[in-house]
Design a protein with these regions (language model features):
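Canonical positions in the second alpha-helix
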Residues: 47, 82-83, 116-117, 150-151, ...
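Structural marker of alpha-solenoid helical repeat scaffolds
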Residues: 50-52, 86, 120-121, 154, ...
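N-terminal leader/linker segments that initiate helical-solenoid repeat arrays
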Residues: 16-63, 69-71, 81, 261
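Helix-start (N-cap) detector for alpha-helical repeat units in TPR-like alpha-solenoids
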Residues: 21-22, 54-58, 91-92, 125-126, ...
Length: 262
């Protein structure tokens, strides 16, 4: 009889924990849907000790996502690492952790996770792209170039890979190559303001300030409310010793930042 009573009490405890977990998890999902990520992360952390073996993995993954969305990148890496201990080699998680490592400037760790993905999927363009970006930020431009070129071979329309290669050329001071490639990309996407800013920056570095201003003009026409474009424009006017226009651009940038909370 005593054993039966113990079993019944244990069963009630288990059912109670399961109900508590399910209640908390539903609340987490609601908070994520409402984009209340900071609160969601707190509730996921409360739910985690109550999660059974099967539920622990999805709880950790969602916790990591919520942490990323609140800028708690180190904690997100820890959560992804714990999830990967449950499912080693999970491609999606390796990719997310690689992205987090990239944000933390832990480039070798990002490359390591990308290599883990490519051991399973050699032509995974997303992993190749993150790896190439990590190499570029490390200053290993030849390896970065190889990665970007391979992505472009796999996905000829991949703009991020093309822009990565433009940046490699710029870092290596291969300005003519950088200008030629960004020119082709602009022909393909003439309504993308970021592309004109990229070309403007190359021209600025070459000392071609008037040309850089023209490209800055194009970017502002396409996105007139972006304060960063006016900040860059102020720098160009300063290079041309036009302090009046530079100050006007800085004031415009400040006003837009206040208006849109950039």
């Amino acid at each position: 009889m005593r054993h039966l009573l113990t079993f019944i009490l244990s069963l009630y405890t288990f059912v109670g924990l399961a109900q508590d977990y399910n209640t908390l998890y539903r609340e987490c999902v609601r908070l994520v849907d409402a984009k209340e990520f900071a609160q969601a992360a707190k509730v996921f952390e409360r739910a985690l000790p109550l999660a059974g073996e099967a539920a622990r993995f999805k709880t950790l993954v969602n916790l990591a996502y919520s942490q990323l969305m609140t800028g708690a990148t180190e904690r997100a890496v820890d959560s992804y690492t714990k999830a990967l201990e449950l499912k080693p080699g999970e491609t999606a998680l390796l990719f997310q952790r690689a992205n987090a490592y990239l944000q933390l400037e832990r480039y070798d760790k990002a490359i390591e996770d990308c290599n883990g993905i490519m051991e399973q999927h050699p032509d995974n363009s997303a992993a190749l792209l993150i790896s190439a970006q990590a190499y570029m930020l490390k200053g290993e431009y030849d390896k970065a170039k190889d990665g970007f070129v391979k992505v472009m071979t796999l996905e000829p329309e991949n703009t991020n890979a093309k822009l990565g290669l433009v940046q490699v050329y710029q870092k290596k001071e291969m300005f003519n190559e950088a200008l030629a490639l960004i020119g082709l990309i602009i022909e393909e996407e003439p309504s993308n303001p970021t592309l004109y800013i990229v070309r403007s920056d190359i021209e600025r570095e070459m000392g071609l300030y008037e040309l850089a201003l023209l490209d800055n003009d194009e970017a502002i026409k396409l996105w007139p409310e972006n304060p960063e474009y006016y900040t860059l424009r102020a720098i160009l006017y300063e290079k041309l010793d036009n302090k009046k226009e530079a100050e006007a651009c800085r004031k415009r940038a400040t006003a837009l930042k206040q208006k849109y909370s950039f």
